[in-house]
Amino acid sequence: NINSIYFDFDKWNIRPDAALELDKVVTLMNKYPGMVIRLESHTDSRAEDEYNMVLSNKRAKSTYDYIISKGINPDRIPKYEGFGESQLVNKCSNGVKCTPAEHQMNRRTEFIILKMK
């Protein structure tokens, strides 16, 4: 199981805590050369749906770019995609009062293992 990484509000840059997790992903992918993953990025519910789709795609791309920059073959990440605010992990949808920590849980990239050899 690979831990999700998290993003600051309205940002898509890789934070230092996320870089540590991504380095673990790279280590794992180097250990298992047949491992293929998909990246799924998300936002919290603040901002317009369309804007959040664009933002989540930028998050997916920055995550992909980081992993590729560490020498992983792009063929091993055949798909990276943003889902905007369509897959919230909690009750924090439009108009619901939530704490900063609750919103943070939704600003994430998840890693789905497609193949493991």
Regions picked out by a protein language model, each given a short descriptive name:
Residues 1-3:
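Pro/Ala/Gly-rich low-complexity, hydrophilic intrinsically disordered segments
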Residues 6-41, 64-69, 111-117:
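Periplasmic peptidoglycan-binding/anchoring modules of Gram-negative envelope and division proteins
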Residues 40-117:
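Periplasmic OmpA-like peptidoglycan-binding domain that tethers envelope proteins to the cell wall
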